[in-house]
Amino acid sequence: MKLTIFKKVSPLLLCGVLLLGPTSCKDFLDEEPPSNLTPDNFYTIPDHAEAAIASVYADMRSGYDGAGIFSSSWQLLEAPTGTSTTETAQNSDLNNLYSLVYDGNTQHVINWWNSSYRIIAQANQVLAKVPGITPMDEAVKKRILGEARFLRSWAYFNAVRLWGDVPLITEPQTIESEDFFPTRAPQEEVYKLIVDDLIAAEAAGLAWMDASGRVSLAAVKSQLARVYLTMAGQPLNKGAAYYKLAADKAYEVITYANANPGVINLFP
């Protein structure tokens, strides 16, 4: 009797398992891990904004990454000038820098290029995502966006002076982005973004000095003076008008420093 009942019930149970099994497994496997963060679900609270801008600052350190034995990436900015020398015979990339025979395969060039566009990419994320975080103190939000603008302009200023025309990327990129493989933009356009970013940072309510090492108003104004000075000469040749812009902006820093020696002491 027991055997007969089992034979009748077993097919019914099997059918139920087959019907319910796929649905149950699918629901189980589709669970969203709550600890996984992506650009789409990360920027939701003010702490995320602070963490995001911190990541941009962190990427600035990559300019000091190693570039082979006894060498760092920053030497790309010094070796080709002819104002320094080295006795490191073991590093062919570094020797090529000093011999002015380096190219896109030289480790220092690769590192500095990647570093510049990591900073730009992270800053673009901050500028695109942080404005949508609510609730958030508007003054803090404005400060963070100003810092991101400065850091992006800093990276582009280095890139345009090193390589001339460079890709001009101002939005977060995905594989679906239309400009995922961007072409090089004219230097004039790159400098326009640099100036626009610095002017926006200048109006972001930054403190004149920040002991924590964050971007300060003094840094923004000083960098803007430097950019104007560069634009006045080669290759843009903006001339006297930009020399005056540079002088006026630098004078703002000097004037404030003289009036507030306890804040900015340029000549201790």
Show which residues each predicted segment covers.
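Short, well-structured active-site flanking segments
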Residues: 32, 160-171
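Bacterial Sec-dependent N-terminal signal peptides
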Residues: 1-34
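Conserved, well-structured interaction surfaces
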Residues: 50, 58-64, 88-163, 179-192, ...
